[in-house]
């Protein structure tokens, strides 16, 4: 279980529930598949999948949860085709115009008819609570998926106050300075990919498999373009992309880290999961600290709001 994307949130209050208590709170919201007329459903599943039954997996102050979502696949083009056919039938058979309001009613009826026959797709979003650092780390590339998990967590727990982890210095400013000044924080190396944006006209230039210190890249920065995505390597152990929202994407754990999990022989899938989780969380905890420091520390919360 190696996270590939990170969206990180600060808990504004300590998380007081034990893993056992959290399991009991999540259990009533266990995932159930979509019924015939449900467009989508979400609920909690064991992080260990079929190898576990608990809705949490905890180790060393880190508590992992897994939120599963299922939705019916009902392409808008299919609904539109059925609607146009129905409207044409009414116009021909009854020799009258179909109003906008009636079209909306017909559309709802068509969706109601098609839903039971629709295929489904599902995804599982993993996250863990770092009780020591008061963080929620979500394995999600999109903010929407992370927000869905947090909304479900609030529904189960009752209250889960948190805010995005924002650094003091704006990420585009820091990332641009790395290339402009040809310097980067200790423990970090530049990768070979970045995305530059022109604030005035929105023009975007994407650089891949390229030396980011090259004159060609610097010339774009000298014209006023800023970096809103950049590839870095943390302590030769993790490759990642940092974006302008301080979200981390396309994480790749190098062998130097993965070998730590493989060095202790696991006798079961559950033990292997536990070892990987323990190592991953320790490494990510330190990486997050280093990256926050590289961007000037954590933004101070406004306690007046």
Curated annotation (Swiss-Prot):
It comes from the Bacteria. One of its GO terms (cellular component) is cytoplasm. Keywords: Cytoplasm, DNA recombination. GO terms for molecular function: double-stranded DNA binding. One of its GO terms (biological process) is DNA recombination. InterPro entries: RdgC. It is found in: Cytoplasm, Nucleoid. It holds the Pfam family RdgC. Its main location: cytoplasm. May be involved in recombination. HAMAP family: RdgC (MF_00194). Belongs to the RdgC family. This is Recombination-associated protein RdgC. It comes from Saccharophagus degradans (strain 2-40 / ATCC 43961 / DSM 17024).
């Amino acid at each position: 279980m190696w996270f590939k994307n990170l969206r990180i949130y600060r808990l504004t209050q300590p998380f007081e529930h034990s893993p056992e208590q959290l399991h009991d709170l999540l259990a009533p919201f266990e995932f159930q598949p979509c019924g015939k007329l449900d467009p989508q459903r979400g609920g909690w599943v064991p992080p260990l999948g079929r190898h576990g039954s608990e809705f949490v997996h905890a180790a060393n102050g880190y508590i992992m949860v897994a939120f599963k979502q299922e939705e019916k696949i009902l392409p808008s083009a299919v609904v539109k085709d059925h609607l146009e056919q129905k409207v044409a039938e009414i116009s021909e058979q009854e020799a009258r115009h179909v109003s906008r309001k009636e079209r909306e009613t017909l559309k709802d009826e068509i969706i109601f008819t098609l839903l039971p026959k629709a295929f489904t797709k599902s995804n599982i979003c993993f996250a863990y609570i770092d009780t020591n650092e008061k963080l929620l780390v979500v394995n999600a590339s999109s903010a929407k998926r992370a927000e869905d998990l947090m909304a479900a967590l609030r529904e189960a727990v009752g209250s889960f106050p948190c805010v995005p982890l924002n650094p003091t210095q704006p990420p585009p400013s820091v990332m641009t300075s790395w290339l402009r000044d040809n310097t980067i924080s200790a423990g970090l190396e530049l990768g070979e990919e970045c995305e530059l944006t022109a604030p005035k006209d929105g023009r975007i230039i994407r650089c891949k498999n390229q030396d980011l210190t090259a004159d060609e890249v610097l010339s774009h920065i000298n014209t006023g373009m800023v970096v809103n995505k950049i590839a870095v390597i943390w302590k030769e152990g993790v490759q990642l992309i940092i974006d302008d929202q301080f979200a981390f994407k396309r994480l790749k754990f190098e062998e130097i880290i993965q070998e730590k999990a493989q060095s202790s022989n696991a006798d079961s899938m559950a033990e292997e999961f536990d070892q990987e989780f323990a190592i991953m969380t320790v490494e990510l905890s330190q990486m997050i600290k280093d990256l926050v420091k590289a961007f000037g520390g954590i933004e101070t919360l406004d306690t007046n709001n």
